[in-house]
Amino acid sequence: MVWSRDQRRKVALENPHMQNSEISKRLGYQWKMLTESEKWPFFEEAQRLQAA
């Protein structure tokens, strides 16, 4: 997932001792909190990458 890849790096750098499972939980919560319009650019990028 385009969004989670970038966000995972950011969260991991900000929280170097956080376990991967906790990072995943945090990312899942953050993704759910985004509106559809906030998510849309990431859906478009994923589609573009799949077509390439």
Curated annotation (Swiss-Prot):
Q: Which InterPro entries match?
A: HMG_box_dom, HMG_box_dom_sf, SRY-related_HMG-box_TF-like
**Keyword presence, DNA-binding:** yes
Q: Which residues bind DNA?
A: 1-52
Per the record, the GO terms for biological process are: cell differentiation; sex differentiation
User: Which GO terms of the cellular component aspect does the record hold?
Assistant: cytoplasm; nuclear speck; nucleus
Would you say which domain of life the source belongs to?
Eukaryota
Pfam families according to UniProt: HMG_box
Question: Per its record, what are the GO molecular function terms?
Answer: calmodulin binding; DNA-binding transcription activator activity, RNA polymerase II-specific; RNA polymerase II cis-regulatory region sequence-specific DNA binding
Keyword annotations: Activator, Calmodulin-binding, Cytoplasm, Differentiation, DNA-binding, Nucleus, Sexual differentiation, Transcription, Transcription regulation
Q: PROSITE patterns, from UniProt?
A: HMG_BOX_2 (PS50118)
Q: Where in the cell is it found?
A: Nucleus speckle; Cytoplasm; Nucleus
SUPFAM superfamilies for the chain:
HMG-box (SSF47095)
Is Cytoplasm one of the keywords UniProt gives this record? yes
Function field = Transcriptional regulator that controls a genetic switch in male development. It is necessary and sufficient for initiating male sex determination by directing the development of supporting cell precursors (pre-Sertoli cells) as Sertoli rather than granulosa cells. Involved in different aspects of gene regulation including promoter activation or repression. Binds to the DNA consensus sequence 5'-[AT]AACAA[AT]-3'. SRY HMG box recognizes DNA by partial intercalation in the minor groove and promotes DNA bending. Also involved in pre-mRNA splicing.
Q: Which family does it belong to?
A: Belongs to the SRY family.
**Subunit field text:** Interacts with CALM, EP300, HDAC3, KPNB1, ZNF208 isoform KRAB-O, PARP1, SLC9A3R2 and WT1. The interaction with EP300 modulates its DNA-binding activity. The interaction with KPNB1 is sensitive to dissociation by Ran in the GTP-bound form. Interaction with PARP1 impaired its DNA-binding activity.
Q: What is this protein called?
A: Sex-determining region Y protein
Species name: Crocidura suaveolens (Lesser white-toothed shrew)
Q: Give the lineage.
A: Eukaryota, Metazoa, Chordata, Craniata, Vertebrata
